[in-house]
A protein has these predicted regions:
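Conserved beta-strand/loop positions that form the S-adenosyl-L-methionine
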Residues: 20
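Short catalytic micro-motifs in class I SAM-dependent methyltransferases
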Residues: 85-86
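A conserved beta-strand element that flanks and buttresses the S-adenosyl-L-methionine
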Residues: 82
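An acidic, carboxylate-rich microenvironment
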Residues: 94-97, 147
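Class I (Rossmann-like) S-adenosyl-L-methionine-dependent methyltransferase catalytic domain
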Residues: 1-16, 24-72, 113-170
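A short glycine-rich, Lys/Arg-flanked "PGG" loop and its adjoining helix->strand segment in the class I
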Residues: 96-108
Length: 171
């Protein structure tokens, strides 16, 4: 899924990329090496330090995205917004509000790419939860495509495993 997301970002017409919850910068450092201008927000000062070492010219900010993006990031527009394994910390209602808030930050023909634990239906999620038993992380709130789609008709879902998917939302 990460390679597919990487290729999709590079296929965008522009190179301005916002990464939400970038961690150590594994994905964004690859994009940075391909001349993408990287912007990002992460909760952890340590993650920013590690990512900044890989991408000295990236514009990285500390902040809890569950409270919104920092003003500096809201002042820009992006060709691609990416979030990998980060937005599952938001409730379903927060996900909807957050995704709506991201749409104006996209340039014309821009896309938001979300790579995460995700399911097409609530039934698939519940089956996976049952199969996982005690290994299920109940602190994380995973994506259910069928429940997001009414709010975002342009949203697409591409499965990469029984529990991993790439959701794409075009402007």
């Amino acid at each position: 899924m990460m390679n597919a997301l990487y290729q999709r970002v590079l296929a965008q017409s522009g190179r301005d990329v916002l990464d939400i919850g970038f961690g150590t910068g594994i994905l964004t450092s690859r994009l940075y090496a391909q001349s993408c201008q990287i912007y990002g927000q992460d909760f952890s000062a340590r993650m920013i330090e590690l990512a900044q070492a890989k991408m000295p010219d990236a514009r990285l900010y500390q902040g809890d995205f569950s409270k919104g993006l920092v003003p500096e990031l809201c002042a820009q527009q992006y060709d691609a917004i990416v979030a990998t394994y980060s937005l599952h910390h938001l409730s379903d209602a927060q996900k909807i509000d957050f995704l709506r808030a991201l749409l104006p930050l996209l340039k014309q023909d821009g896309c938001t790419f979300i790579g995460d634990v995700a399911f097409r239906t609530r039934e698939e999620l519940e089956a996976c939860r049952t199969a996982a038993g005690e290994d299920w992380d109940s602190d994380e709130i995973y994506f259910v495509y069928d429940e997001l789609r009414p709010h975002f008709p342009a949203l697409t879902f591409e499965s990469f495993s029984h529990c991993t998917a790439l959701l794409t939302l075009r402007k």
